[in-house]
């Protein structure tokens, strides 16, 4: 078993998969500098966050929440694509596990398809992502080495590898959607199962193709997610009743996630993991509070039927498509405005409170600034998406 795990964690296995898909490292350009090994003359990669030199006067202390250590430097390796079908397929698949997908798919589901489904998806997604992000910084398993692996995503190089949160999120979204809709809508179950498997498989394979994870990282992420879905499934009906909880419920929804973010595992160097985790937990808290506000203040014009209720999937017409895109565009514009406004205000307040120079971008990485401003910003975004955007839709006459 130990030998099998070591083989699944081998970077050469990832490199062989990349070569099979037509992704190769570019030939060396000219002689090495002073005979140095490529790893010895590694360059700083754009997007790799490094520990700021100081936090405070005199530069004597590391940034709060960080140990003094240099971030890992990655060998900047050019690559050659010999099969553009796989290149574009896996680049698109990788995007299905990134922020751009979640900020489009989840709001679109809430505004145009079914708010109950979106709530289930978001809560399971938040749970899975938090556990995955924390596991990375607790286990501290490295990503595949480069060379031999070609790495296509530079922003995440500073993060650890095990488990793959892209694989976890894709598996959670796909199969939570399948399990929730099979008791609510009439459609061929086999078709839904195939779509869920294809979606999650493409995202998982994209993590190998982009060189960001080993096979063990991906399999570990899928297995952890499967276990979490099994363990949490009995509580899914309870999730549907959260909007009718007591008036103290929003306090718990704010305090618990903020506490988890503020006490996130200390990293050896700065990486975007803590900021991303804060964003995810804050968005989940905002969405949950938004549902509670809608129920408590009776802001929903007509209550939707709770799960499970068997319904026919309505046919897709031009009118429905235009209406859905219009509602989505209106909602995204409002969300972006709220995000920018709250972010600027929260940063100004925190900078003033901690007496930090406004132009000091490094200050955003400090624990006492990064966590509060991220949390306030994305909690506001979650509340806006579930409460104010639907109100704006009704005001504009968008059913």
UniProtKB/Swiss-Prot annotation:
Residues the record marks as active site: 166, 213
InterPro entries attached to this UniProt entry: P_Acid_Pase_2/haloperoxi_sf, P_Acid_Pase_2/haloperoxidase
Enzyme class: hydrolase
Keyword set, alphabetical order: Endoplasmic reticulum, Hydrolase, Lipid metabolism, Membrane, Transmembrane, Transmembrane helix
Tissue: Expressed strongly in kidney and heart, followed by brain, colon, small intestine and lung. Not detected in skeletal muscle, thymus, spleen, liver, placenta, and peripheral blood leukocytes.
Region (Phosphatase sequence motif III): 206-217
Places the protein is found: Endoplasmic reticulum membrane
Transmembrane segments: 88-108, 121-141, 160-180, 185-205, 219-239, 247-267, 280-300, 318-338, 371-391
Domain of life: Eukaryota
Reaction catalysed by this enzyme: sphinganine 1-phosphate + H2O = sphinganine + phosphate; sphing-4-enine 1-phosphate + H2O = sphing-4-enine + phosphate; (4R)-hydroxysphinganine 1-phosphate + H2O = (4R)-hydroxysphinganine + phosphate
MF term (GO), any: sphingosine-1-phosphate phosphatase activity
Site description Stabilizes the active site histidine for nucleophilic attack, residues in chain: 217
Chain positions covered by the region annotation Phosphatase sequence motif I: 136-144
Main location: endoplasmic reticulum
Membrane topology type: Multi-pass membrane protein
Family: Belongs to the type 2 lipid phosphate phosphatase family.
Alphabetized PANTHER family for the sequence: SPHINGOSINE-1-PHOSPHATE PHOSPHATASE 2, SPHINGOSINE-1-PHOSPHATE PHOSPHOHYDROLASE
Record's function text: Has specific phosphohydrolase activity towards sphingoid base 1-phosphates. Has high phosphohydrolase activity against dihydrosphingosine-1-phosphate and sphingosine-1-phosphate (S1P) in vitro. Sphingosine-1-phosphate phosphatase activity is needed for efficient recycling of sphingosine into the sphingolipid synthesis pathway. May play a role in attenuating intracellular sphingosine 1-phosphate (S1P) signaling. May play a role in pro-inflammatory signaling. Plays a role in the regulation of pancreatic islet beta-cell endoplasmic reticulum stress and proliferation.
Protein name stated in the entry: Sphingosine-1-phosphate phosphatase 2
UniProt source species: Homo sapiens
Underlying gene: SGPP2
């Amino acid at each position: 078993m130990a030998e099998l795990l070591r083989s699944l964690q081998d970077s050469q296995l990832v490199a062989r998969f990349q070569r099979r898909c037509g992704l190769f490292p570019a030939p060396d350009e000219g002689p090495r500098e002073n005979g140095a090994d490529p790893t010895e003359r590694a360059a700083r990669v754009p997007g790799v966050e490094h520990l700021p030199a100081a936090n405070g006067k005199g530069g004597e202390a590391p940034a709060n929440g960080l140990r003094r250590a240099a971030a890992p430097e990655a060998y900047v390796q050019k690559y050659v694509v010999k099969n553009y079908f796989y290149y574009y397929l896996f680049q698109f698949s990788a995007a299905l596990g990134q922020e751009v997908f979640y900020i489009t798919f989840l709001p679109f589901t809430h505004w145009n398809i079914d708010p109950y489904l979106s709530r289930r998806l978001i809560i399971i997604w938040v749970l899975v992502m938090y556990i995955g992000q924390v596991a990375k910084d607790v286990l501290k398993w490295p990503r595949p080495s480069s060379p031999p692996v070609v790495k296509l995503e530079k922003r995440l190089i500073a993060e650890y590898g095990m488990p793959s949160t892209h694989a976890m999120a894709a598996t959670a979204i796909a199969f939570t959607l399948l399990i929730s809709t099979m008791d609510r809508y009439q459609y061929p179950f086999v078709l839904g199962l195939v779509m869920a498997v294809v979606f999650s498989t493409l995202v998982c394979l994209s993590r190998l193709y982009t060189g960001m994870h080993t096979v063990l990282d991906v399999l570990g992420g899928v297995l952890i997610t499967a276990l979490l879905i099994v363990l949490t499934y009995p509580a899914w009906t309870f999730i549907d009743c959260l909007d009718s909880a007591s008036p103290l419920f929003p306090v718990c929804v704010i305090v618990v996630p903020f506490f988890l973010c503020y006490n996130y595992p200390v990293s050896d160097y700065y990486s975007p993991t803590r900021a991303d985790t804060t964003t995810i937990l804050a968005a989940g808290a905002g969405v949950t509070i938004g549902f509670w506000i809608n129920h408590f203040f009776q802001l929903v014009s007509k209550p939707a039927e709770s799960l499970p209720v068997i319904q026919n999937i309505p046919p897709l017409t031009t009118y429905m498509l235009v209406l859905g895109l219009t509602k989505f565009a209106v909602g995204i514009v409002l969300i972006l405005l709220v995000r920018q406004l709250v972010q600027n205000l929260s940063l100004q307040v925190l900078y003033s409170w901690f007496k930090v120079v406004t132009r000091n971008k490094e200050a955003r990485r400090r624990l006492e600034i990064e966590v509060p401003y991220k949390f306030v910003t994305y909690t506001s975004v979650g509340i806006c998406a579930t409460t104010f955007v639907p109100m704006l839709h009704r005001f504009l006459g968008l059913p």
